[in-house]
Curated annotation (Swiss-Prot):
GO terms for biological process: intracellular iron ion homeostasis; negative regulation of cardiac muscle hypertrophy; regulation of the force of heart contraction. Residues 145-235, 236-334 form the Glutaredoxin domain. Residues 2-116 form the Thioredoxin domain. This is Glutaredoxin-3. Keywords: Acetylation, Cytoplasm, Iron, Iron-sulfur, Metal-binding, Phosphoprotein, Repeat. Residues 110-131 are annotated as: Disordered. [2Fe-2S] cluster binds at residues 158, 260. The modification Phosphoserine is found at residues 116, 119. Homodimer; the homodimer is independent of 2Fe-2S clusters. Heterotrimer; forms a heterotrimeric complex composed by two BOLA2 molecules and one GLRX3 molecule; linked by [2Fe-2S] clusters. Interacts (via N-terminus) with PRKCQ/PKC-theta. Interacts (via C-terminus) with CSRP3. Interacts with CSRP2. The modification N-acetylalanine is found at residue 2. InterPro entries: Glutaredoxin, GRX_PICOT-like, Monothiol_GRX-rel, Thioredoxin-like_sf, Thioredoxin_domain.
Amino acid sequence: MAGGAAEAAAAVVEVGSSGQFEELLRLRAKSLLVVHFWAPWAPQCAQMNDVMAELAKEHQQVSFVKLEAEAVPEVSEKYEISSVPTFLFFKNSQKIDRLDGAHAPELTKKVQRHASSGSFSPSGSEHPKEDLSLRLKKLTHAAPCMLFMKGTPQEPRCGFSKQMVEILNKHNIQFSSFDIFSDEEVRQGLKTYSSWPTYPQLYVSGELIGGLDIIKELEASKELDTICPKAPKLEERLKVLTNKASVMLFMKGNKQEAKCGFSRQILEILNSTGIEYETFDILEDEEVRQGLKAYSNWPTYPQLYVKGELVGGLDIVKELKENGELLPILKGEN
C-alpha cells in the first residue's frame, strides 16, 4: 500500500516558483499538462489532489502539476486564478482549457478528452476553427435566450454576471446559461465569434443582444420585456414537468446515482417492475424542489407521479408493491 501511495505522489509534480513553472511548460510541451492551482487551507483541494493522483496512474502520458496559488502569485495573476481549486490544461505551452471548482467527474472527462485528442497546434489547419465556429453557433442557439457568464445563475463569479442574472430574474425572463470558466476554448472563441470582448453576453435566438450595459439600457427603455422570452409561471412549469413522462420520479440524484437512501430504494423498486420512467433531480433546481411540495401538498422526497398525478413517496410505493397494486398503477390501469 505504502509503495502504491508513493508511486501516485511521484506522478504529480509540485511547482514552487514561476521559473520552475515556465520551465515545466517548455519541457512538457509535447504532452498534455494539467495544473492544479490549490491552497492547503481548502479541504476540497485535498480531495481534488487525491483525484489527480488517481488520474496520474491511469494517464501516464499526461503530466500533472500542483501549484499553490498564493505561494506563486505571479502565475496565479497571469492566468486569472481567483479561487481554488482551479485546473488549467496546456498543450504546446498554450492554455487550451480551464475548470473552476471541485468537480471530479468533469476533471476526469476533460483529461480523457484532451489526452485522446492528439497534438494541439495553435497555428494548425482551419478545421478546428470551423469546428469551434459550429460549436459556438450551436451553443448560442441552445435555448431561446442564452447567457454566457462567469459562474452559474446560482453562483455568479463576478459582479457584472450577478447583476445580469438579477435583471433577468426580476423580469421573469426564461434563460439558460453557460459558464465560460468551464471551457477556455468557448471563452476565447466567443469574443471573436461575436466581436464582443467582455462577459457576460446575452443572446436571443442565437443573436447577440449585448452585455450588461446594453441590457440595462433595454431595461430602462422598457424594451427588454419585448425582446426576451418570459419564463412560464411556476405552477405551469410543474404541470409540464409532472407530465413529462407517463411515469415521473422526482428524487435526489438520478437513475445512475441516487443521493439519498430513500431515493435509492424507490429506484430499486421501479427498476424491478421493468416499467420505463424518467427522473428529475430536485437538488439541481431549488424552485422546483420547494414548489412541488406546495403544488402536490407533499412535503418530502422522493415523489412518484403517473400521468401527472401524485402516487406518493417511498412508503406508499412500498405498500402498493406489497399489495400487488403498483404495476397496474404504473401502467395507468387504475
